[in-house]
C-alpha cells in the first residue's frame, strides 16, 4: 500500500512576537508549545501566514521556555512581521496499511493573540471496517486555566 504523509502536530493561529532577519534560518518557538504538540528541535515545519498569505517551510529551534515566543528567522523573517498570525504544522511519514489498522493521532494547539492556549485538540483517525473515521476531540483538561 505504501507510505502516506499525515499531519502530526499543529500550532494554530500563533502570533509572531519578533522577526529576526539576521539569524541564519529557522523559526524559534517556545519549547513548552513544541512539547505540547510533539514537535522536535530541527524538525521541518510548513508555515502559513494568515495575515498576508505567505506559505513557507523551515525548521524549528527551541526558544526560552514559557516566553510564548514565535520568531521567524533569516529569510522567513522577511515573510512575517510581529503581530502576524501563523499556522505551523508538521507531517510524519506513515505506513498506509498501519494507519488503516491502528489509526493515527495529531495534536493541535490553538492560541490567542498573546500565544496563550485557548483550545487543544486531538485529531484522530480511528480504524473501521471500510477505512477510517475522523474524530476531532477537544481536550479541555489539557488547557491551562
From Swiss-Prot:
It holds the Pfam family Asp_decarbox. Signal peptide: none annotated. Substrate binds at residues 58, 74-76. It catalyses: L-aspartate + H(+) = beta-alanine + CO2. It is found in: Cytoplasm. Is synthesized initially as an inactive proenzyme, which is activated by self-cleavage at a specific serine bond to produce a beta-subunit with a hydroxyl group at its C-terminus and an alpha-subunit with a pyruvoyl group at its N-terminus. Its cofactor is pyruvate. InterPro entries: Asp_de-COase-like_dom_sf, Asp_decarbox. Pathway: Cofactor biosynthesis; (R)-pantothenate biosynthesis; beta-alanine from L-aspartate: step 1/1. It comes from the Bacteria. The keyword Cytoplasm applies. GO terms for molecular function: aspartate 1-decarboxylase activity. The modification Pyruvic acid (Ser) is found at residue 26. The active site is at 26 (schiff-base intermediate with substrate), 59 (proton donor). GO terms for cellular component: cytosol. SUPFAM superfamilies: ADC-like. Binds 1 pyruvoyl group covalently per subunit. Keywords: Autocatalytic cleavage, Cytoplasm, Decarboxylase, Lyase, Pantothenate biosynthesis, Pyruvate, Schiff base, Zymogen. Belongs to the PanD family. This is Aspartate 1-decarboxylase. It comes from Synechocystis sp. (strain ATCC 27184 / PCC 6803 / Kazusa).
